[in-house]
């Protein structure tokens, strides 16, 4: 796993995946990238960031420029920083199989199409990073933290399955399938208000 943007979203994604057995090999912030092909201790890196330090303060890894995180070969590459970080000029550098988008619109449409043509699976931002909205809803309805986390996992898993099945069935990009799902749900919700 490589995480581009080790802030709130990036830290939580890295922690969640590490708990599932994934190995973090790279992470970056605005000060640089830390890379270790043998793995980075996620809890220790989070502690470093929580002390207002940078990922490059992590001992036991190679310190690289911030942009170098794009070049790290990995199974899962998580953009969790800002929009349009991957575009036509750098998309060829990305060597991964799965991209759960943690940031909002981290790829240009052209870059997303190019990755799709290379069989890179992209989970759209508003599906993959919906945890905050789901958590707020759970809190609003009086749910506990453990209930909120369970709901987040269940909802994101179910939405991801539905989007990927629709994309496969209709031979479209996952983002298009996700937009269609969202539009259908909004129309349905609006029909209840009439």
What are these regions (language model features)?
Residues 96-194:
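Adenosine-phosphate binding glycine-rich loop
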Residues 1-73:
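Glycine-rich phosphate/diphosphate-binding loop of Rossmann-like nucleotide-binding domains
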Residues 60-61, 78-84, 102-106:
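A general structural motif
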Residues 29-32, 82, 104, 126-128:
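Short, ordered loop/turn segments at secondary-structure junctions
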Residues 2, 76-78, 100:
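Structural motif
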Residues 64-74, 82-99:
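Rossmann-fold NAD(P) dinucleotide-binding segment
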């Amino acid at each position: 796993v490589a995480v581009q943007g080790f802030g709130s979203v990036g830290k939580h994604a890295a922690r969640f995946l590490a708990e599932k057995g994934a190995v973090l090999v790279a992470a970056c912030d605005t000060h640089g990238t830390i890379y270790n092909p043998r793995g980075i201790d996620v809890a220790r890196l989070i502690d470093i960031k929580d002390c207002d330090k940078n990922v490059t303060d992590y001992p036991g890894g190679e310190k690289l420029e911030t942009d170098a995180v794009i070049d790290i070969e990995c199974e899962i590459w998580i953009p969790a920083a800002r929009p349009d970080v991957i575009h036509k000029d750098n998309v060829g550098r990305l060597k991964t199989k799965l991209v759960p988008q943690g940031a909002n619109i981290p790829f240009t449409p052209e870059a997303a199409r190019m990755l799709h043509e290379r069989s890179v699976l992209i989970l759209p931002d508003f599906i993959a990073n919906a945890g905050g909205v789901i958590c707020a809803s759970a809190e609003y309805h009086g749910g506990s933290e453990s209930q909120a986390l369970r709901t987040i996992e269940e909802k994101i898993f179910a939405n991801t399955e539905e989007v990927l099945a629709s994309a496969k069935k209709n031979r479209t990009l996952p983002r298009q399938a996700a937009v269609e799902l969202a539009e259908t749900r909004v129309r349905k919700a609006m029909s209840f208000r009439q």
